């Protein structure tokens, strides 16, 4: 109320196992779109997850339907294992393997019992992202929002983690927000955002309909432009 729309006409449907890629021009609101699914911003229209209108649910029910992981994740001052399990008795090794972090953890002096966070071993950006993603997969929800989850990963690691992500989320819908586009041909759908407008379709359809997307994709082909 009293403000202007950040974007409009966002329309798409997704089935379990779908990964939806979201990207756009600078400051287009793609991260805001991710947080709309957390109801952190008001919206007009309808957002339904498993038949539930998100705006009508209490926080507990929303938390049971939607998971969110940002590009700068928070780690707890606890062990690697506890950061993943969060009190559950899950097989943490398989989730560390899924995010290609198991070998690095095994090389730590105390393995999965290594303390991380502000009071423990200082992890690199890529390590922290992968540990947080392992936690997200361990406690996956029907809808998972990933906001630039691979921004600190090299190309080869990102490719492998993405391949594993597809296997682990066959019973979920994933919305993956990113400015790195070389994996977007593998997305089930792509949403391009620019000047408050959105266009949804397959990668090939967006390449044909949105010249700026095609320019960015071709510039980044091979993943070299954003590799760290």
Task: Put a short name on every predicted segment.
Residues 45-53, 62:
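Conserved ABC transporter NBD signature motif
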Residues 23-25:
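The feature captures the beta-strand-to-loop junction immediately N-terminal to the Walker
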Residues 43, 102-131, 140, 146-149, ...:
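ABC-fold ATPase nucleotide-binding domain signature/coupling loops
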Residues 37-39:
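Helix-to-loop junction immediately C-terminal to a conserved catalytic motif
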Residues 73-115, 140, 156-157, 212-215:
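Conserved "ABC signature" C-loop
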Residues 13-14, 61:
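Conserved hydrophobic segment flanking the Walker A/P-loop of ABC-type ATPase nucleotide-binding domains
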Residues 163, 167-170, 185-228:
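C-terminal portion of ABC ATPase nucleotide-binding domains
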